């Protein structure tokens, strides 16, 4: 019996030490955790949620804009709120970020949080939480957002060059995502966020009138859809017009975006390429449950990929700062 007891004791100690090691790895590897503000600012998440709800209820297009802002923040300098800084030559001024909107939501939430818990909640965390809440308000499933990020002290327009572009091939997209620790499934899943997105015509008009110098439209687009897009984006005059990336379901977070790719109705060249390339097409098919593929639940997988993305290059501990105002360094 003593031998059995000693064995059990050894196993318990081993399991405890293993758990301790895993916990240490998690803290040092990411530095964020669910419920980070549970003691220091218990109402942090509810304040952000109610703020986002108020703004999105007034303007449903803001949901996609906040989601896009979080993506752009994470892909440059990590998820540190650097996209929020105002001033000359900051990330906000880069061409790829000129169309970003919704900064007032983050500022509004920050003002309320500073009144409730001064100097506690970072702008980077507010943006991460707001992105989740925007998806939920659009009909998507919720997920737990690890918090504890600190705000970065650098914001340079010159660092924005690594953002995915609307004409990127699948190979280029995969390279850019892999550089951030994201795999091919994450790529397809996160781009699926375009289900509530829009784009200015200037980012895809090359597909409509003179694709690759052919004086014709991109043959990858369904001909009837070409006519629709040409009407929405008149040649030489409609560059700033906005078009939904998920036709017929612009404000609903669902899988119809993937159905549009299957039907050759992807607006951006980079989006339609996900259906045309075998390495990404298989994931699109799985989200649609096609041809016997093991199905994936888009809403569930989106939350998982968002957690991965939101931990890119986070600043924790004594790194960075907790800004008093999200648009300016302390």
From Swiss-Prot:
Chief localisation class: secreted
Disulphide bridges, residue numbers: 41-117, 74-79, 123-326, 201-233
Domain of life: Eukaryota
Binding site for substrate: 164
EC primary class: oxidoreductase
Glycosylation site list: 212
GO molecular function: heme binding; lactoperoxidase activity; metal ion binding
EC numbers for this chain: 1.11.1.7
Presence of the UniProt keyword Heme in the record: yes
Residue sites binding heme b per the record: 194
Subcellular location: Secreted
Cofactor(s) named in the record: Ca(2+); heme b
Gene3D superfamilies assigned to the protein according to its UniProt record, in alphabetical order: 1.10.520.10, Peroxidase, domain 2 (1.10.420.10)
Signal peptide annotation: 1-23
Ranges for region Disordered: 149-168
PROSITE patterns linked: PEROXIDASE_1, PEROXIDASE_2, PEROXIDASE_4
Alphabetical list of InterPro entries matching this protein: Haem_peroxidase, Haem_peroxidase_sf, Peroxidase_pln, Peroxidases_AS, Peroxidases_heam-ligand_BS, Secretory_peroxidase
Binding residues for Ca(2+) 2: 195, 246, 249, 254
One GO cellular component, as annotated: extracellular region
Residues carrying the site annotation Transition state stabilizer: 68
Record's keyword terms, sorted: Calcium, Disulfide bond, Glycoprotein, Heme, Hydrogen peroxide, Iron, Metal-binding, Oxidoreductase, Peroxidase, Secreted, Signal
Membership in a protein family: Belongs to the peroxidase family. Classical plant (class III) peroxidase subfamily.
Name of the protein: Cationic peroxidase 2
Source organism per UniProt: Arachis hypogaea (Peanut)
